[in-house]
Design a protein with these regions (language model features):
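S-adenosylmethionine
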Residues: 1-163
Length: 163
């Protein structure tokens, strides 16, 4: 059951699509992963994960949750990042190019940041800010695991970044 205030806001926002929104809670969870282009030389076999392409993300794939790719040594080695497929859309829409400077203001745990870094291909600068110190530490770990070397991880209030 959704809190009434939230439900009322969503009804007003979605109008005739509100029923579809409610029905989405009864659908199976979509699970996805993104291959890491910074480790593109990887030739391992990911077929056991039953991958199907995410239409809006060339490095993104749906997987069968029962295959549990988070337990694979490939995941620990940073060859891919587990990410909900809809969360792959912002970086695809921004489409940063190698050599550009990019800011991810609310960066943890690192899904968007690692995807942005993959698009930069080690060129340019990615500034990743996370206001919560514990989450910033998780973000740093994910950046390191995926082999990202052109990123700066900050733990600041966004207002301080303008000073």
């Amino acid at each position: 059951m959704l809190p009434e205030g939230f439900a009322a806001r969503m009804r007003a926002l979605l109008g005739s699509e509100y029923g579809d929104f409610l029905a989405s809670f009864d659908r199976p969870l979509c699970t996805g992963l993104r291959k890491n282009p910074l480790k593109a030389s990887f030739t391992g076999d990911l077929s056991r994960f039953s991958l199907a392409p995410v239409p809006w993300c060339p490095t993104g794939f749906y997987y069968d949750a029962a295959s549990r790719p988070g337990l694979s040594p490939y995941h620990a080695a940073g060859l891919y990042y587990l990410q909900e497929p809809s969360a792959m859309a912002p970086a695809e829409l921004l489409d940063p190019q190698p050599g550009e400077r990019v800011l991810d203001l609310c960066a943890a745990p690192g899904g968007k940041s690692t995807q942005l870094a993959g698009k930069l291909l080690g060129k340019g600068l990615l500034v990743c800010n996370e206001i919560n110190a514990k989450r910033a530490k998780i973000l740093s770990g994910n950046m390191e695991r995926l082999g990202i070397s052109n990123a700066l991880v900050l733990n600041e209030h966004p207002k301080k970044l303008t000073e």
